[in-house]
């Protein structure tokens, strides 16, 4: 059995397009655009002049609008001026009426005003005094509260420090005791186990005191020995210096 032939004939697309001939395009071509009718230079000048002049109808419409706008502005100004004049006249009338009424009631109002002003000033002084007292009391209370808070904080801090020191000392003593128990467990296992912790701590402190006293005694002995040696050396030097002078 032979293989099937799957080959396809190659067709050149350019050659196929040429064989079909020119395409019938719908619409204007590039040549139509290039060959379009164009105005002469004189016609262009006329169009530009017309644009500069503008249309007569638009100019007439603008003139009418301007006239109407001017009339409206004048009316509005007249209204404002008349309103301002009337308001100024009303104010002047009110001032005159107040002056007339003030002349008649000046004598009666002066006495009442003086009494009311004095009473108002006294009330204000009392209110200010009360406010000052309240402010002083508040400041005094706040200072006392702050002082008490600081004292309580300092006491708490001292207590905490003491507790921490006691705890550290106890821990150190317990650690030292545990080490010494391990060291001396072979020699005296029963005595260390039978005693309570407090008694054992006292014994350890007594032993520490004894060891410190023994160390002090040993240092004193060594100092005495050194002094004795220096004294003997001085005696020998004196004897050696005096021996050649004697014959």
UniProtKB/Swiss-Prot annotation:
Stretches with biased composition (Basic and acidic residues): 70-80, 165-176, 211-221
Location of region: Disordered: 19-38, 70-247
Biased composition (Basic residues): 89-102, 128-140, 222-239
Gene Ontology MF term list: RNA binding
Phosphoserine PTM positions: 82, 191-192, 194, 196
Domain of life: Eukaryota
Keyword set includes Phosphoprotein: yes
Listed Low complexity bias regions: 103-119
Record's keyword terms, sorted: Phosphoprotein
Keyword Phosphoprotein: yes
Signal peptide (from-to): none
Protein family per UniProt: Belongs to the FAM133 family.
Protein name stated in the entry: Protein FAM133B
Species, as recorded: Homo sapiens (Human)
Upper classification of the organism: Eukaryota, Metazoa, Chordata, Craniata, Vertebrata
Recorded name of the encoding gene: FAM133B
């Amino acid at each position: 059995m032979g293989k099937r032939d799957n080959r396809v004939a190659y067709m050149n697309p350019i050659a196929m397009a040429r064989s079909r001939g020119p395409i019938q395009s719908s619409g204007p071509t590039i040549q139509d655009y290039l060959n379009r009718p164009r105005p002469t230079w004189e016609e262009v000048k006329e169009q530009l002049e017309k644009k500069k002049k503008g249309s007569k109808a638009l100019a007439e419409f603008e003139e009418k609008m301007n006239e109407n706008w001017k009339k409206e502005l004048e009316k509005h100004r007249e209204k404002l001026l008349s309103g301002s004049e009337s308001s100024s006249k009303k104010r002047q009338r009110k001032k005159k009426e107040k002056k007339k009424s003030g002349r008649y009631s000046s004598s009666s109002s002066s006495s009442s005003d003086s009494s009311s002003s004095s009473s108002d000033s006294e009330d204000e002084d009392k209110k200010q005094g009360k406010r000052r007292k309240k402010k002083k009391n508040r400041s005094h209370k706040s200072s006392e509260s702050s002082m008490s808070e600081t004292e309580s904080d300092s006491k708490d801090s001292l207590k905490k420090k003491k507790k921490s020191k006691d705890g550290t000392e106890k821990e150190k003593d317990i650690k030292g005791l545990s080490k010494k128990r391990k060291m001396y467990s072979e020699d005296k296992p029963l005595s260390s186990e039978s005693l309570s912790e407090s008694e054992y701590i006292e014994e350890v402190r007594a032993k520490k005191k004894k060891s410190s006293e023994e160390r002090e005694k040993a240092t004193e002995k060594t100092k005495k020995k050194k002094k004795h040696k220096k004294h003997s050396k001085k005696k020998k030097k004196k004897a050696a210096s005096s021996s050649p002078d004697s014959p």
